[in-house]
Amino acid sequence: MTSLTQRSSGLVQRRTEASRNAADKERAAGGGGGNGEDEAQSRRDEQDDDDKGDSKETRLTLMEEVLLLGLKDREGYTSFWNDCISSGLRGCMLIELALRGRLQLEACGMRRKSLLTRKVICKSDAPTGDVLLDEALKHVKETQPPETVQNWIELLSGETWNPLKLHYQLRNVRERLAKNLVEKGVLTTEKQNFLLFDMTTHPLTNNNIKQRLIKKVQEAVLDKWVNDPHRMDKRLLALIYLAHASDVLENAFAPLLDEQYDLATKRVRQLLDLDPEVECLKANTNEVLWAVVAAFTK
């Protein structure tokens, strides 16, 4: 499996008095733990998006962001030579579901199982409103015995020699994600002729959204670099790692000056060199996120 990178961001979090009181009550009750913190973080992230003025129509999933970074603006398709994006998008789905409180890893137990040997468990089967995510969630929920993160990335990509497991493959993922972006007004749909066949393409129609995405990635490793993945927004951290795993992160760095480019790639390397097994033990982490990182960087 290909190597994968980082995701970082210094997202300013605003807490209201009510949310602080709720958090205090949760701690006083002794419940919630890391999972409660993840759900609270997800709610705060959504509030931050609202504060920034992003409408629901332009709020993108991790999969859509990675695909958008990989799409050629005018041509409307990803590079024919990119054989990494398929597995990268499946990793995005697992992290997206985890950040939304749908998936978690089984307990590590007394023997301290590694991230790559721990199984993925369905925490909640509540619909997400995204067809691809719900399809992946259904597979995880109904599969017994459970599978590991690495196995799920392979199964959802169709990379298995077991014919009995081919039904796990999510088909036409890039095309379905592109159609989502068309509905959100980011892309459009065209037909292009390639010698012997016609191909549906999705050229960029709203450059502002893509430029905001590129700027967000650049700032995460330049102006807003915090030198600590646990101080970064989890969603942005995951975006950096999975954009690298999907071989599309370079597209975000292409406009940078040489000095900025060198600094950005150096900081990405710092993230890639982190040990997921160590990072997942720290406070307020998402274990599925680090398990996906481990699967791509092992």
Curated annotation (Swiss-Prot):
It is a peripheral membrane protein. Residues 1-11 have a biased composition (Polar residues). It is found in: Golgi apparatus, Golgi stack membrane; Golgi apparatus, trans-Golgi network membrane; Mitochondrion intermembrane space; Cell membrane. GO terms for cellular component: cytosol; endosome; Golgi apparatus; Golgi cisterna; Golgi cisterna membrane; Golgi membrane; mitochondrial intermembrane space; mitochondrion. It comes from the Eukaryota. GO terms for molecular function: cargo adaptor activity; enzyme binding; phosphatidylinositol-4-phosphate binding. A 1,2-diacyl-sn-glycero-3-phospho-(1D-myo-inositol 4-phosphate) binds at residues 81, 90, 171, 174. Disulfide bonds join 84-108. Residues 1-57 are annotated as: Disordered. Keywords: Cell membrane, Disulfide bond, Endosome, Golgi apparatus, Lipid-binding, Membrane, Mitochondrion, Phosphoprotein, Protein transport, Transport. The keyword DNA damage does not apply. Phosphorylated. Pfam families: GPP34 (PF05719). Residues 190-201 are annotated as: Beta-hairpin required for oligomerization. Residues 14-28 have a biased composition (Basic and acidic residues). GO terms for biological process: asymmetric Golgi ribbon formation; cell adhesion molecule production; cell migration; cellular response to rapamycin; gene expression; glycoprotein biosynthetic process; Golgi organization; Golgi ribbon formation. Phosphatidylinositol-4-phosphate-binding protein that links Golgi membranes to the cytoskeleton and may participate in the tensile force required for vesicle budding from the Golgi. Thereby, may play a role in Golgi membrane trafficking and could indirectly give its flattened shape to the Golgi apparatus. May also bind to the coatomer to regulate Golgi membrane trafficking. May play a role in anterograde transport from the Golgi to the plasma membrane and regulate secretion. Belongs to the GOLPH3/VPS74 family. Homodimer. Interacts with the coatomer complex. Interacts with MYO18A; the interaction is direct and may link Golgi membranes to the actin cytoskeleton. Interacts with GCNT1; may control its retention in the Golgi. Interacts with VPS35. This is Golgi phosphoprotein 3. It comes from Rattus norvegicus. The lineage of its organism: Eukaryota, Metazoa, Chordata, Craniata, Vertebrata.
